[in-house]
Amino acid sequence: MNANELFEKIRVKQVIGTLDINVTDITTDSRTASEGSIFVASKGYTVDSHKFCQNVVDQGAKVIVVNHQQDINGDVTQVIVPDTLRVASLLAHTLYDFPSHQLTTIGVTGTNGKTSIATMIHLIYRGLGKGSAYLGTNGFQINEHKTRGANTTPETVSLTKKIKQAVDENAEAMTMEVSSHGLSLGRLRGVEFDVAIFSNLTQDHLDFHGTMEAYGHAKSLLFSQLGEDLSKEKYAVLNNDDDFSKYLASVTPYEIFTYGIDHDAQFMAKNIQESLQGVHFDFDTPIGTYSVKTPYVGKFNISNIMAAMIAVWSKGTSMEDIVRVVENLEPVEGRLEVLDPSLPIDLIIDYAHTADGMNKLIDAVKPFVKQKLIFLIGMAGERDLTKTPEMGAVACRADYVIFTPDNPANDDPKMLTAELAKGATHNHYVEFDDRAEGIKHAIDIAEPGDTVVLASKGREPYQIMPGHIKVPHRDDLIGLEAAYKKFGGGPSEH
């Protein structure tokens, strides 16, 4: 595309050079700039990428978007604007032909449940035989092809490229987890959402947002981003079991569907039957009552599957078809995932990393604990520590608790476990500053009939260590290796 055409609707501050040149790509990552690229520099929290402008010119970039003139050598056009990342969104959506307009785009926000709901929607679409994409904590996936990602919500250019890739590979729908960080930082500017889903709001990320009010406001941006053009068929799906839904309803101009278990809603789960193999409930809806079976465990997963079903139904799929598919869905990776049912213990991993999430996790597991409940949790470094003692208190609903760090980064692991221990309500706990050793200890003390829950990480494949270095780590693999060593079994014996 000609750069003149690309910048046509942007009121730039100053252009040094010519825009009468062809460009093929846009990037905010200096390492990926190449011949014909537009490079957008920005000043981040830790790095100002303006300092890489000479590098990108040497790599062949034809245009750089900056917030002040750069002293660099080479044949390059400089476009000076006050807000480079805002311009990056405009450029990316224009260059890639507004890809979110070309498929059904569903956004899921909330403190807990984002990954489960978004994954369930993706799996429902695949079960219906439709092309689908997922983007979130577990990576980026088009149909069954998956790649890992660094952030729940990628920066704006990378996000737009992923939506474009989904369109090019014939996805009919793309479901993405929408983080409060991504909303606050403007990473989703220009994304045309068709359905916005809210799961819940509990304390988290106050190290970034400062207050619960600011955190809640960030979540609400997804619903205001639906826009005001009422000629379009757009929907909000809100959890009536969370009081924050009332506020979100007030800022949403489109039709709203509410769901709930404990509070009256348009869509409700009734006559719930639970086991470690899944749940069965009557789904009471405005269009009839359906008998729903799912492989997911726990009351909170009933809320999650209702939200997913409503979202898919709202865009035209019959509820009968959705109910049929839901019965055979795969587990959501790292979300109340039972590892190897042949073991004499119930070994479970989960991503719960807030007090509310852990409460719901323990509520889900406790009815099926045959002997002891051994519960391992971690606290992340460089995060809001005000929530930590409450997490420790909730963990002590278990019979035995193991406190560990979780991505300690530059914080002292012993300090993190001590903060968790401040909330302990009994003395049946131990602290490990090495998470892997804590997991091995959990298995070592477990006896047949016990339930071991490894919480906080799910299948996250690394630990963030000092210097923000990512060291390979998998709770599930460490736990299984220790369990097979103690109890026997494993892949070689199956």
UniProtKB/Swiss-Prot annotation:
Motif stretch (L-lysine recognition motif): 406-409
EC top class named in words: ligase
Compartments, record wording: Cytoplasm
Keywords on record: ATP-binding, Cell cycle, Cell division, Cell shape, Cell wall biogenesis/degradation, Cytoplasm, Ligase, Nucleotide-binding, Peptidoglycan synthesis
Catalytic activity: UDP-N-acetyl-alpha-D-muramoyl-L-alanyl-D-glutamate + L-lysine + ATP = UDP-N-acetyl-alpha-D-muramoyl-L-alanyl-gamma-D-glutamyl-L-lysine + ADP + phosphate + H(+)
Gene Ontology BP annotations: cell division; cell wall organization; peptidoglycan biosynthetic process; regulation of cell shape
Transmembrane segments: none
Pathway this chain belongs to: Cell wall biogenesis; peptidoglycan biosynthesis
E.C. no: 6.3.2.7
Post-translational modification N6-carboxylysine, affected residues: K219
Family statement: Belongs to the MurCDEF family. MurE subfamily.
Function of the molecule: Catalyzes the addition of L-lysine to the nucleotide precursor UDP-N-acetylmuramoyl-L-alanyl-D-glutamate (UMAG) in the biosynthesis of bacterial cell-wall peptidoglycan.
Designated name of the protein: UDP-N-acetylmuramoyl-L-alanyl-D-glutamate--L-lysine ligase
